[in-house]
């Protein structure tokens, strides 16, 4: 099964990982240095041992591809996975005059009354991002995060570098190049980012008419984040392969700090007790030629028959 690589990762970290503290204060079981490989010829690696919301993966990747850094696009597509980081910037600003939201990530998990206030404040914030242009332009922006680095890296001479477009052109003209790399980790810009990039750098490789991609991910939330990352980069590889006339090869996922949060352990044990199903297939609109032209309706998975979703809190 295509999914076994992920399940093996989870088992390995549970059994051999080290207990560590972390930035969020949640605590983790962590392992440093791990690699998974997914043969994309065998299907699309969207996990089946729990339902993974593919619509959120699609809209986030399209957001990256647009070079966008404002959550308004995500909210318009009912995607809330970046809300907490934008909201954090707002409540830390002098413009916020609502209830005390200090340490809202942890307090919302242990205090039901606070969680009710927090959810109401966050919903009002997200609604205003969409409806109030000036407010949304300011507080919806996450800084120079993924989309900006992929599509508009700022060079030393003030030039703008579209790393992704450059890689696609190199795939067409010099497919054996070892320089087909896109980096989201820009040390000069990290302080301005709401969340420094977890998936930091990816590289493409062509062999026998197939396109493979390797991702280096510095920080890997195994239960919540990694399933998204696997599917997102498999989708990106598939989109680019289609554009340049190649078949898909492997997605290689290299992890730095691979961790399971302490409040995800029971959930991941539940997932590991389940039996994987057959991998779904990816459908891409044959009428689209550029990865920058896709809309939500142009990307679908077929034959997806997952086990039920398993909820878990996000560590902010």
Swiss-Prot record:
This is Thymidylate synthase. Pathway: Pyrimidine metabolism; dTTP biosynthesis. It comes from Levilactobacillus brevis (strain ATCC 367 / BCRC 12310 / CIP 105137 / JCM 1170 / LMG 11437 / NCIMB 947 / NCTC 947) (Lactobacillus brevis). PANTHER family: THYMIDYLATE SYNTHASE (PTHR11548:SF9), THYMIDYLATE SYNTHASE 1 (PTHR11548). Pfam families: Thymidylat_synt. DUMP binds at residues 23, 178-179, 218-221, 229, 259-261. Its EC number is 2.1.1.45. Catalyzes the reductive methylation of 2'-deoxyuridine-5'-monophosphate (dUMP) to 2'-deoxythymidine-5'-monophosphate (dTMP) while utilizing 5,10-methylenetetrahydrofolate (mTHF) as the methyl donor and reductant in the reaction, yielding dihydrofolate (DHF) as a by-product. This enzymatic reaction provides an intracellular de novo source of dTMP, an essential precursor for DNA biosynthesis.
């Amino acid at each position: 099964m295509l999914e076994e690589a992920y399940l093996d990762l989870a088992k390995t970290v549970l059994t051999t990982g080290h207990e560590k503290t972390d930035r969020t204060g949640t605590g983790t079981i962590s392992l440093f240095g791990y690699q998974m490989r997914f043969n994309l010829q065998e299907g699309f690696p969207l996990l089946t041992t729990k339902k993974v919301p593919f619509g959120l993966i699609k809209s986030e990747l399209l957001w990256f591809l647009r070079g966008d850094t404002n959550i308004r696009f995500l909210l318009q597509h009912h995607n809330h996975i970046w809300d907490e980081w934008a909201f954090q910037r707002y409540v830390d600003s002098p413009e916020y005059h609502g209830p005390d939201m200090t340490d809202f990530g942890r307090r919302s998990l242990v205090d039901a009354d606070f969680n009710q206030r927090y959810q109401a404040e966050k919903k009002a914030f997200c609604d205003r991002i969409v409806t109030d242009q000036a407010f949304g332009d300011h507080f919806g922006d996450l800084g120079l995060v993924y989309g900006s680095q992929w599509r508009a890296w700022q060079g030393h001479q003030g030039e703008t570098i579209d790393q992704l477009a450059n890689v696609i052109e190199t795939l067409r003209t010099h497919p054996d190049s070892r320089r087909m790399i896109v980096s989201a980790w820009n040390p000069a810009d990290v302080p301005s980012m709401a969340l420094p990039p977890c998936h930091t750098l990816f590289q493409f490789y062509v062999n026998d008419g197939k396109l493979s991609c390797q991702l280096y991910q510095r920080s890997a939330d195994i239960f919540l984040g990694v399933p998204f990352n696997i599917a997102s980069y498999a989708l990106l590889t598939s989109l680019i392969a289609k554009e340049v006339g190649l078949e898909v090869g492997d997605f290689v996922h290299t992890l730095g700090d691979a961790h399971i949060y302490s409040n995800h352990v029971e959930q991941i044990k539940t997932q590991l007790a389940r039996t994987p199903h057959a991998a779904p297939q990816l459908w891409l609109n044959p009428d689209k030629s550029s990865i920058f032209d896709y809309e939500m309706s142009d990307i679908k998975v077929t034959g997806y028959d997952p086990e039920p979703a398993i909820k878990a809190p996000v560590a902010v």
